[in-house]
Amino acid sequence: MRRLCTFGMMLALTTGCSPPAPQAPQATSEPVSKLGIRPQGDTEIQPDLSQVPPEVQKVFAYIDEHIDEHVENLQKWIRQPSISNSGEGIPESAEMVKGFFDELGCQQTQIFDVGVTEYGAPGNPVVYAKCDEGAEKTLMIYWMYDTMPVTQPDAWMAPPFEGRLVEQAPYKKVLIGRGATNSKGPQMSQLNAFRAIKAVHGRLPVNLIFVAEGDEERMDIGLRKFVKDHPELLEGADGMLRFGSQSPSGSGGYGGGSEGCVYVELTTSGTAWGRGPTVSDIHGSNKRSVDSPAWRHIKMLASLVSDDGNTPLIDGFLEGIQPLTEWQEADLKNAAARTDLKVAAENVGVARYISDDPYTMLKMQRYGTSFNLDGIWGGNMYAGGAGAILPNKVTSKHNFRYVPNMTGPDIVKKLRAQLDKNGYKDVEVKMIGDVPWAKMNSDNDAGRALKRAYEVMNIPHGELRADWGIGGGGGAAGGYWPAYLFGNGEVGEKVSSYAGIPIAAGGGGYGGRAHAANEFYVIEGAGRVYGMAGAEKVVAAMAYAFAGRIPPAPSPTN
C-alpha cells in the first residue's frame, strides 16, 4: 500500500509522516441556500447509476441536494478579484485558496513566496497542499487562481466580479464573471466534489496534492521557479487531474499535453532610433518637422505579418514543425463532423473564424502557429477628447503560439534577425516568458479513470492514445498550460529534476468567452452539456475510478 507522507508547515523541521485525516461524521444537514438551481437543468443525458456503487450514488445525491450552496461557493470566489498582471487581489486570493484547502482538511497547506524569477519579475505566490486520506493512491490537482484583467467593463452584461446568474440560450442559467470558465468554475466544481465526498463519507478515496499558481496569465513564471526550487514537493503522486470541460456539442476530452507559447514586448523609441522625441512625448504640432517613433512602430509591425495579419513573415519561423500523425488527422475529421462553427463562434465571441471549414478551423486551433498583437500603447491613451501628442516611445505585446519541435528562444532569435533584416535594428525585443510545449500519452491510469467517469456520465468521448501529442480529442479547446513542468512525456524543455507523472485533463460542464467580456460558466446544462452538478459528478466518479472503486464498464452486447 502506498501512503502519502504528510509534512508540517515548516518543511525543514518535518520528519516522518502525520496520521491520516480523522474520519468526519456523515452529513445529514439540509441545503442552506435557495438559488433554485435545477441540478439536471435541461440536460438530455444522465448518469448511469447502475455502473457505480452505492457510495458514489450517495455522493451524486448529495451534490444534487446541495447544488445551490455549491454555486454560491463559486460566486464568492468570483467576487474576489485575482488579476495577476496588475497584482489586484493576488495576496487575498492566495489566502482564500489556502482556506479552501484548510476547510477540506488537508494536513499541510502553505503559501510559497517564490521570489524574483529568471525573467526579472517577481512571481506571485504558489499555494500548496497535501491531504492524506490514508488511501493507496495519490492524485495531484493543478490549479490557477489568477485571471485576466477586465479591459472593457462597459461590454459586460453584468459586473464582472458579481457572479450574477443569467439566462443564455440554450442554458437557463449561466454564471457571468471574470474567471468563470478560466478557471474558477471548473476548479470550484472539483473542490465541491471533494467536499461532497468528505461530507458523505468522511474521507476521500484518494490522497490529494494541490498546486495552485497565481501566474498562469503571466506565463507561469512563478510556478516555473517553484518547481525548480521544490521538485521534492511533487513526489508521491500517481497521476494528475487538470480541470477541463465538455465541448459545445457535449464531447469529453483527455488532453494533458500543451502547445508552446512565448511572450515578447517590442519597443520603438526615439532614443534608440536616433530620430524623433527622446526625453518624453512632445506636442503633436511638431510632427510637421519631426519623425514619429509611433509610425515607425506601425510600419515595423506590418513588416512582420502578411496583409491579412494571419501569417508571420519571419524567416525560418516554421522550421522544425512535426507533421500530424495519421490518428491526429482522423481525430480532427471526426471532431469536425460534430462541430457547428456558428455556435462555436458565438461561444468565443467572434463574428466568424478565419476558415469556414470546420476541419481547417480545428486544425488551426489545435495544432496551428500564430503571431498575435495582444496590445499596444504610447502617447495619448485617453478615450474621447483630444490632445496633440507626438509619442517618444511605443510598446506592443505579442504572443507566439508554437508546436513541436519549435522552441520559444529560437523564435525570439529569428524575430530579432528578421527585425534587423527589415531595417529595425533599433527596436527592442524583451522576452516576458516562455511556456514550452508538452506531449502526453493519454492511455494512463488518470486517463483511464477519466474515461470511466465519462462512461458513467454518458458523455461522448474518444479513445485513449499513447501518441496523443499536444492536444485534441473532443473536449473544449484551450490555450497553453504548464504541462511541461508536470508531465512524464516528451517536453520542449525540462527545467527540474522532477520526473513527472501521467496527466489527464478533462471534465464535465462547459463555459466560454475566456479572456473576453461576459465570460461564463454553465450552471444549468442543456442538450448533451452538463451544468455544474454534472461537472462535479464527473470529478467524483473520476476520483473513485482512479482509486479502483468503480467496476470496469460493462461489455457491449450484440
Describe each PLM feature range.
Residues R2-G8:
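Sec-dependent signal peptide recognition
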Residues T14-G16:
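C-terminal motif of bacterial Sec signal peptides marking the signal peptidase cleavage site
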Residues N73, I83-K137, E162, A169:
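A non-catalytic alpha/beta surface segment that caps or lines the substrate-entry region
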Residues E136-A212:
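Active-site metal-coordination/substrate-binding segment of hydrolases
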Residues S249, L313-K393, R401-K414, N422, ...:
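An extended, acidic, His-containing surface patch that forms the Zn2+-binding/catalytic region
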